[in-house]
C-alpha cells in the first residue's frame, strides 16, 4: 500500500472511502450526561439527537488518544497522513502529532504528516480526497504536503443552524438571546476564519432565508469554482441539502458534488436540521 490517510471522525467518509483500506477513521467520543458514545460505525444519529435534546447541558467531545493515531500509523504504507478537526476546536490535531512522534521515535525513516484541516466535517473529507488525488497523480510526499496545504488555505466552510440550543448550551449565545432568536425565528449564517475558528457571517429570519444568504456568500467568495468539489453535509435533513445543492448549481459551476449525512461530532455541532457547506 503506497499511502494511508487517517481522518478523525468529525470528517465523514464517503461509502467508497469506507470500502478503501487506504482510509481509516480515528473515533472521537461524545458525552451526553452519563452516556458515552463512540463516534464510529455504531453511531446512531437519531438516538444521539434525542439525548442531546433531552439533556440541559452541552454535549462534550473527547479527541482520539495519541495511541489511537500511533496504531493507525503503524502500517507498511510508504506515505502516512492524518486529517484532523480544526485545532481551534479540538485537541485532535495535537493528539495526532503526538501519535506521529511516538512512531517516529521507533521508525525515524517513516514519512508522516498531520494536516490541521482548519475546518470540520466534509472539509476534512475533501482534504482526504485531495491527498488521494495527489498520491494517484504520482506526487512525491513533500509535494503532496505542499499541494494539500495550499488547498486547505483555499478552502471555505459555511453552515446554517436550524436549532440554536447547542450555541446556547456551550455559552456562545446567551439564554436570553437564544430565546429571542428562537421567538423571531432568527437563524445565524456561520463560517470559518482563516485560522479555523467559527464566526458569524450574517443572520436571517427563517431557515430558508438564512440558506439563501449562505448561498450568496458561497457564490461571492468562490468566483473560480469550476475546478473545485462542493461538499454538503446535513444533520437529518436530506431534502434541505438537496435544495442547497440545486441553489448553488444554478449560480456556479463545480467539478463534482458530495452530499453526506453528519456523523457524531458533526451532529453535535450542527444539531438537528443543520447544513454544512465546504468548497
Please annotate each region the language model reported.
Residues 2-63, 68:
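N-terminal glycine-rich anion-binding loop in soluble enzyme alpha/beta folds
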Amino acid at each position: 500500500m503506497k499511502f494511508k490517510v487517517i481522518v478523525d471522525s468529525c470528517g465523514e467518509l464517503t461509502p467508497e472511502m469506507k470500502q478503501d483500506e487506504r482510509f481509516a477513521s480515528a473515533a472521537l467520543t461524545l458525552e451526553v450526561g452519563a452516556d458515552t458514545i463512540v463516534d464510529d460505525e455504531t453511531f446512531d444519529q437519531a438516538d444521539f439527537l434525542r439525548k442531546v435534546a433531552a439533556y440541559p447541558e452541552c454535549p462534550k467531545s473527547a479527541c482520539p488518544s495519541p495511541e489511537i493515531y500511533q496504531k493507525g500509523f503503524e502500517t507498511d504504507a510508504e506515505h502516512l497522513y492524518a486529517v484532523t478537526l480544526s485545532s481551534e476546536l479540538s485537541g485532535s490535531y495535537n493528539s495526532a502529532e503526538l501519535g506521529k512522534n511516538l512512531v517516529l521515535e521507533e521508525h525515524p525513516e517513516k514519512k508522516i504528516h498531520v494536516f490541521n484541516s482548519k475546518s470540520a466535517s466534509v472539509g476534512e473529507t475533501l482534504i482526504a480526497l485531495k491527498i488521494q488525488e495527489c498520491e494517484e497523480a504520482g506526487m512525491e510526499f513533500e509535494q503532496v504536503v505542499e499541494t494539500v496545504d495550499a488547498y486547505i488555505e483555499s478552502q471555505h466552510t459555511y453552515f446554517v443552524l436550524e436549532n440554536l440550543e447547542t450555541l446556547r448550551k456551550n455559552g456562545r449565545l446567551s439564554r436570553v438571546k437564544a430565546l429571542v432568536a428562537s421567538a423571531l425565528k432568527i437563524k445565524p449564517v456561520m463560517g470559518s476564519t482563516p485560522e479555523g475558528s467559527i464566526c458569524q457571517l450574517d443572520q436571517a429570519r427563517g431557515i430558508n432565508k438564512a440558506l439563501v444568504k449562505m448561498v450568496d456568500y458561497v457564490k461571492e467568495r468562490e468566483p473560480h469554482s469550476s475546478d473545485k468539489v462542493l461538499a454538503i453535509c446535513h444533520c437529518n435533513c436530506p431534502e434541505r441539502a438537496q435544495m442547497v445543492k440545486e441553489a448553488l448549481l444554478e449560480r456556479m459551476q463545480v467539478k463534482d458534488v458530495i452530499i453526506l449525512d453528519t456523523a457524531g461530532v458533526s451532529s453535535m455541532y450542527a444539531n438537528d436540521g443543520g447544513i454544512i457547506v465546504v468548497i
